Amino acid sequence: MPTEANTYDPQRIESTAQHYWDSTHAFEVNEHSNKPKYYCLSMLPYPSGALHMGHVRNYTIGDVISRYKRMTGHNVLQPMGWDAFGLPAENAAIKNKVAPAQWTYKNIERMRTQLKSLGYAIDWSREFATCQPDYYVHEQHMFTRLMRKGLAYRRNALVNWDPVDQTVLANEQVIDGRGWRSGAPVEKREIPQWFLRITDYAQELLDGLNTLDDWPEPVKTMQRNWIGRSEGLEIQFEVRDADNNALEALRVFTTRPDTLLGVTFVSIAAEHPLALHAAKSNPALAGLLTEMKQGGLSEAELKTQEKRGMDTGLKAIHPITNEQLPVWVANFVLMAYGTGAVMAVPGHDQRDQEFANKYGLPIRQVIALKEPKNQDESTWEPDVWRDWYADKTREFELINSAEFDGLDYQDAFEVLAERFERQGRGQRRVNYRLRDWGVSRQRYWGCPIPVIYCPTCGAVPVPEDQLPVILPENVAFSGTGSPIKTDPEWRKTTCPECGGPAERETDTFDTFMESSWYYARYTSPNAHEMLDKRANYWLPVDQYIGGIEHAILHLMYFRFYHKLMRDARLVDSDEPAINLLTQGMVIAETFYRKNPDGSKDWINPADVNVECDERGRITGATLISDGQPVLIGATEKMSKSKNNGVDPQIMVTKYGADTVRLFSMFAAPPEQSLEWNEAGVEGMARFLRRLWTQVHHHAAHGPATALDITALDTAQKAMRCKTHNTIARVEDDYGRRRSFNTAIAAVMELSNTLARFDDTTTQSHAVRQEALETMVLLLNPITPHTSHALWQTLGHPETLLEDLPFPKIDTTALVRETTTLAVQVNGKLRGTIEVATDAPREHIENNARTEPNTARFLEGLTVLKIIIVPGKIVNIVAR
């Protein structure tokens, strides 16, 4: 009869291990170590109230790396905190009629418990939430410094404005041009906003990517494209009104000055000063500008919207031909990008061509390929787009360009640049797609921007001795406006410069501000200043882990803020993280039923019975509650919208944390998508039960004697060889390859080999002890609770396994005395032979010929030759 001790009971095992870790403060670290430091960090979670499988995968990857690094002799920091400000708390406050702070802190309590149940080796003494004043006070300090240095400034910018709720909406809150809650048509409104001059660091951010050798190439490519460095000319176009009066000149940046003779009109943004000037005397234009203020500001929406425009009646003077070009307002030109004006070359720009064809504007060809590959490349048509029209990588020459005919791109660029610079009408310029970071949010639940507005002194930074500016947490939040805007006691204050009446800034910071420097605060969480000398001990982060969806915004601001802290002499390093791992998504099947109106009701996989074919593919599905069919959707990322998420807590309760951890590491390599499959989870549970039984069965035969490698027979040596080969594989998988699935597979192979090792001698017991100890230690980074318990079962005192060294390879064990060779006859496998690794050729040939099955196939044949591939194959050629 199995006893409680030798039955695999995950809840008991995990509770015991976690109690030991907590009571010994096992994972709290400091800087006073003679070991090399290693800082492993997974992106901090938003406290939504419940972990999802994406969290589990992310934090398990980080935990595996952290525990492995500790076993290889490193002083490892793995902290945790909460990205606690943001929109979801406001939405929950509206829905549940509870203050955002109360909702947030309650969720943190719940999620902390969930994380602890998974057994992560986290230094909880460094925990903080970004909504705590003793965190964001340092962010406010930094902002006031940036104001004084001119790196923080205020200007007007467009936002999505809900006129009913009287609030600014994020792009994702604009649905079909309407506010998500009020349903009112959204307006584009220009309001004052605070910005950080990230563009001052554009080139450094670009150059720094070349030093990030251990960041994924796709992330670096996305950042390069987002920074968008381009070299071109800025050219001035004189502008005249209908009465031929000169107006302010238009500045246009172009990377294609070679197409200048193809310009047939100029496009400007609806907010451009010239558009506003023209609208004063043109009611139709004024009406269009008002319409263009409707709808959202997201790039996706702007790309897909119908192209619209109107002639302003103004004329731009072509800087070479002096031709009068119409100036059009176009809804695809944005004031925030470049100069808000574009020289339109419809013959060689697809967007301009579509616009010109819609409004009947002239289209001219000014480029021809020198060596067209086919008829399409020899043909230019004004109403058909072909990619070669705009491809400057091909060899082409200018045509229809007067004195510039025959020039290629580079020659035309140089000639025109020299001409305009000589005339004072243009200059070479490096431009960036990157725009300054708008950090103002017209929301309540965020860090208050530390600025005071005085009628006399203007915008004044809050003095450092008056920081933090604390956000009041006990408020009634309705979603209409912000509580701090309507709270005169909080809003009204005194100007720190003149002592006169003044008001506080009621905008709060973009939550990317908090998540751009949190990693540094973990290094010195109780420091009076933003950071102290401990930061330079731990930074940069050695391993950062998070989704590739953060490639542009978070990871760009993360790098930028690190440079701000460096320039403030808070850190010594240039980049915040050495290695970046972008884990794949967790995906799952989707099921649904269609409603009469065409909408879909998504059904959770846990509520569905499925039928599968012999290959395991789903062929049918029914709803458990009514037995009726449901439709099978695509396999997609787990999400609330598709209702295909799996609650990690249910899985932990059902199978145990180690089983969930093991499956999440075994099902796919870290960078690839993981398809959730409960049958796979059950398979991992079976493996852990089998390992548990193996260890307890072995331990029941008493302690092992000391291993004497000189006394081992061939089978025992082969078993040791398998053990140490496994160490070598797993060490490479953990350390270099980060291939945890193959590490697990290697341990499973070792377990299976050991199960077939049925020798019962004293030395075989010692060999088995070594193999089991090895498996327990190799699995410890992934299944730490089970390893903690089994280590004691194998006769060791309770200890922190991470403080034990990772198993060492005995190279003498890898030297096999015998080797197995496959024997082929005319290329077909007929048998195997076991020979000494140093056996002479004659011995190998004789053994191969006389192998019983091989000998049968050689009867009546003449052996022509024997080919030996050392260590692998013997091929006998006969006829």
Curated annotation (Swiss-Prot):
Molecular function terms from GO: aminoacyl-tRNA deacylase activity; ATP binding; leucine-tRNA ligase activity
Q: Which domain of life is it from?
A: Bacteria
Q: Which reaction does it catalyse?
A: tRNA(Leu) + L-leucine + ATP = L-leucyl-tRNA(Leu) + AMP + diphosphate
- Disulfide bond annotation, renumbered to this chain: none
The gene for this chain is leuS
**NCBIfam families the UniProt entry points to:** leuS_bact
Gene Ontology process terms (BP): leucyl-tRNA aminoacylation
Which InterPro entries does this one have? aa-tRNA-synth_I_CS, aa-tRNA-synth_Ia, Leu-tRNA-ligase, Leu_tRNA-synth_edit, M/V/L/I-tRNA-synth_anticd-bd, Methionyl/Leucyl_tRNA_Synth, Rossmann-like_a/b/a_fold, tRNAsynth_Ia_anticodon-bd
Which Pfam families does the UniProt record give? Anticodon_1 (PF08264), tRNA-synt_1 (PF00133), tRNA-synt_1_2 (PF13603), tRNA-synt_1g (PF09334)
Q: Which parts of the sequence bind ATP?
A: K640
List locations, semicolon-separated.
Cytoplasm
Query: Predominant location of this chain?
Result: cytoplasm
Motif position, 'HIGH' region: 45-55
The family annotation for this protein states: Belongs to the class-I aminoacyl-tRNA synthetase family.
Query: GO terms for CC?
Result: cytosol
- Give the enzyme's EC designation: 6.1.1.4
Q: What is the lineage of its organism?
A: Bacteria, Pseudomonadati, Pseudomonadota, Gammaproteobacteria, Lysobacterales
Where the record places motif 'KMSKS' region is 637-641
What are the record keywords, sorted?
A: Aminoacyl-tRNA synthetase, ATP-binding, Cytoplasm, Ligase, Nucleotide-binding, Protein biosynthesis
Under which name does UniProt file this protein? Leucine--tRNA ligase
